[in-house]
Amino acid sequence: MLLRGSRLGDISGEVLDFISSRDVDLWIAEADVLVDMAHLLMLYERGLIPREDCARILTALKELLAEGFGVLGEGEDIHEAIEAYVIERVGPAGGRMHTARSRNDEVATCIRIALREQMLGLMDELIQMIDALVRIADETRERIIPGYTHLQHAQPTTLAHHLLAHADALIRDLERFESTYERVNLSPLGAAAFASTGFDIDRYMTCELLGFSGLVENSMDAVSSRDFALEVLSDTSILMINLSRIAEEIILWSTSEFGYVEVNDLFASTSSIMPQKKNPDTAELVRAKSGTAIGSLVGALSICKALPMSYNRDLQELTPHIWRGIGAARSSLRVMRGCVSTLRFDFERLERSSTEGFTTATELADSMVRITGIPFRTAHQIVGRLARLPGKPSLEDLDRAAMVVADLRLSQMGFTAEDLERALDPRTNISMRSKPGGPAPEEVSRMLDARKKYLESASSRLAEKRSKVDSAIRRLMEGVDRTVTAT
């Protein structure tokens, strides 16, 4: 094998399979070639390899991209396989591509490039998911629904208010990913094994060619730390927890017991034995994939725990967790966006349900405090006694409850039947809650406008990140072409 050289003897197939990362390395194969190209251009620029050798190696790498990675032979990992491919076509001069470089800084750089690409895609999909929630909220500003605590009817609210709560949680997820991206998009290349190199390299040149925004400066930290990956997996786990809450509500609300929504056929399945069934399978799988993401985080944390400086092969086992976790999140975002966008709401049932369970009790207590001046706790106890009665309470019921609790007649303290009627009306309840963040129509409209502006800004920031990376890679490939054609 190429990297065992004359130091080590042969290795058994079983051991090779055990230590190999080839299958997982396909995630970083294209990134590996980009790293090779940037490193070669830097080596040539610094006078560390001849132009002819640089051009021949770059040509071989371009051919590999055109042919696809299926042409690579066996090897311990993708890095060895690519180098072997180049040497087979270029001869011993192909070995110059590894000058002033270790697999340690190489793989760390490749992971960051591939992860950066995944994060850009995920953030785009997350923006689309938030946009879907905001659009539905915009269309349902005054649709009344029951609000819940402990999964029991609590207070009336609007569907828009409810959906914006989910949107705001996802906005925080987006902000976490944006922040983490800045720490992911740093270059470890040039750190070599861990102690840098005696060759006169230019780390800033490769950093710029690969679209990084800066260096992971300390060479030991650059190759041995994977906290950036842990941070991504943490962000991913929180995102998946938030998505699982939406999924759980879709599952519950689509049951015959709730009957609030119907899942589109595209996102449902039926039973193999019960022909009447329409199961919300996609939502159930999103709920399950939140466990996959959390498991990836826990696995990654466990691998990184107590590793001595600097690089350890344990980190090879971390990489599958990265791709598994972020893959679960991206697929869940795409499916959940489609599922949510095509839900059919039963607005009549939602509004009818909004008054069940005495959901206007809080406003009744508040109204008693405002009109009569009694302490809130007294009002709370009076309304609590009313809640025992069946049906809609009358002013006489209210007076009787007040007499039992506080020896008061609220009707003699200015509280009228009209006040009672207003307090029990769900629309009045909602309209009175106009403070920042409340469900009143004017406040929901303000929040919707703010979220739309936020999404425009977020899309612009993401486009700028994407443009910087794409421009850098384009300049890299232009540099490759110039070097190849100049010979």
UniProtKB/Swiss-Prot annotation:
Nucleotide-binding recorded as keyword: no
The alphabetized list of GO BP terms reads:
arginine biosynthetic process via ornithine; L-arginine biosynthetic process
GO CC, sorted alphabetically, is: cytosol
**Enzyme Commission numbers on file:** 4.3.2.1
Q: What class of enzyme is it?
A: lyase
Q: Give the reaction(s) catalysed.
A: 2-(N(omega)-L-arginino)succinate = fumarate + L-arginine
Show the Pfam families listed in the entry: ASL_C2, Lyase_1
Q: Where in the cell is it found?
A: Cytoplasm
The alphabetical list of record keywords is: Amino-acid biosynthesis, Arginine biosynthesis, Cytoplasm, Lyase
- Which InterPro entries does UniProt cross-reference here? Arg_succ_lyase_C, Argininosuccinate_lyase, Fumarase/histidase_N, Fumarate_lyase_fam, Fumarate_lyase_N, L-Aspartase-like
Which pathway features in its UniProt record?
Amino-acid biosynthesis; L-arginine biosynthesis; L-arginine from L-ornithine and carbamoyl phosphate: step 3/3
Highest taxon, organism lineage: Archaea
In alphabetical order, the GO MF annotations are: argininosuccinate lyase activity
Enumerate the HAMAP family for this protein: Arg_succ_lyase
Say which family it is in.
Belongs to the lyase 1 family. Argininosuccinate lyase subfamily.
Report the protein name in the record: Argininosuccinate lyase
